[in-house]
Design a protein with these regions (language model features):
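Acidic, glycine-rich flexible loop segments
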Residues: 93-127
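Extracellular glycan/ECM-engagement signal in secreted proteins
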Residues: 118, 125-144
């Protein structure tokens, strides 16, 4: 007849499982937003004590040619730091598109850590404290 393990034998496994579930649940929610059309999504990241905003656009009228030094995807991702950096189109292998992000309604403003974004029917515009940024829409993507 088979015996079930004692509760003492199960305790280490149960403790490890609770610790794993607790650490997974402790992950912070993404900080960002998506446009009402869900064509554009942006998320804030802190890397090496610097704050960065990354925005991805799903559909564009045209896709720019990928540079030779980019082995990943090109054209749909943009980033800007909170200070001192120009905005850039980036080479990427992932996405910040997340249907769980809150919607930034038309006419609304999103501000975090020196970064500001506005949403209107034409698209999304984001800039930093130095007024460097980008405007994204299906029709065109401008860096400034």
């Amino acid at each position: 007849m088979s015996r079930l393990p004692s509760s003492r034998a199960l305790l280490p496994t149960a403790t490890a499982l609770v610790a794993f579930v607790s650490s997974a649940a402790a992950q912070p929610a993404p900080i960002g937003f998506q446009s009402p059309s869900k064509n554009i999504a942006c998320q804030l990241f802190s890397i090496d004590n610097r704050d960065w905003l990354r925005c991805d656009i799903v559909e564009m009228a045209t896709t720019p040619k990928r540079p030779a030094d980019c082995d990943l995807d090109w054209g749909h991702a943009f980033e800007i730091s909170a200070r001192g950096e120009n905005a850039a189109r980036i080479c990427y292998g992932d996405t910040v598109i997340d249907p769980a992000l809150p919607v930034l309604g038309y006419g609304d403003i999103w501000q975090r850590k020196g970064l500001t974004c506005t949403s209107d029917q034409a698209g999304v515009t984001c800039f930093n404290a130095d007024r460097h940024g980008f405007s994204l829409s299906r029709g065109k993507q401008d860096l400034f």
